[in-house]
Amino acid sequence: MAADRHYQKGNPEIEPQKSVVTKSDVATFNSAESVSVPNSRYIKPEAFKIPKALFVIYSGGTEREKDYFSLIDKNTELFPFIRTAFHADPKFVKGGKPSIVRFATEKTKEYQESASKENPDHYFLITDVDHFEQFLPEMQQECNTSNIELIISNSCFEVWLYYAEKSNRPVDFVIPQNKLEISSAFKTWANTQINGGLKPTKAIFNIEQNIANAENNYVEENGFPTLFSTQMFRLAEKMLPFVKDGLEQLRSEIERRRIKHK
C-alpha cells in the first residue's frame, strides 16, 4: 500500500477528519477572516461515507499548484468523498529533462497495489510548456502507458488561475521574443490584471467558471495546447462532482459572515 494514501477504501469505520478552514485558505476570498463552517449549518457525513475517489497529482511546481488543492484535504468533512495526494518533483532541474515522469510512474504502481476496482484512483501529471516543450511528446507517451493523464498548461499553471477570473484570452499581454521569458512575464502581468493578484486558494471557489473559461479559450496544435491554453479544465471537470457541494457550503458561510460584519 502506498504510504501517502490518506484513507482505506471499503472500511466504514474510518471517519473523515475534522474540518478546519484556515486563514490562509480563505483570506484571499474574504479579507483576512478565517472561516470554519459551524456544525449546525451542515450535516456531518455519516461514518460510512468514506472517500470514493483519490486524486493523485504529480507536479513540477511546488507552490501555486499545491495550494490550489490544499483546501480539499484540510476540510474533509466538507469534502468527504474525495482525497488528494500531491507529489512535487523531488529532483526538479529547471530546463533539464523532467524526472517527474519516472517518479510518477513508480509512485503510481504503489498506489495501484491498493487501488479499488469499484472506485479507481485518478492520476494526473501537471506540467508547463515553458521549459519542457521539447520533452512533451515523450512525457505524453510515458504517461499514457502508466494510465496517468498529462495536464499541460501553456505557458504555465498561472494561465489556469487567470481563467478563474477572466473569460477572454490575455490579448493585452506583450509576448516576449524569448520563449523562456514568457512564463515569468505572464505571471507578473496577470497579477496586475486580477484584483488581489493570482490566488490559487481563491481560484478554486470559481471552479465552474474556471472550467468554462479555460475550455472556451482552449486551442491545441498536434495534440498540445497553444499559448494561453490549459488542459487543467479536464482535471477540474473530473474533480467537480466531488467538491461542488462543499464549495457551495463555504461560499454560503463566507457570505453569512460578510453580511454579519457589515
Locate the predicted segments by residue:
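N-terminal carbohydrate-binding/catalytic regions of secreted carbohydrate-active enzymes
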Residues: 50-68, 92-104
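C-terminal accessory helical subdomains adjacent to catalytic cores in phosphodiester-
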Residues: 1-53, 66, 70-90, 110-262
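Short, charged, amphipathic alpha-helix that recurs within catalytic cores of restriction-modification
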Residues: 103-111
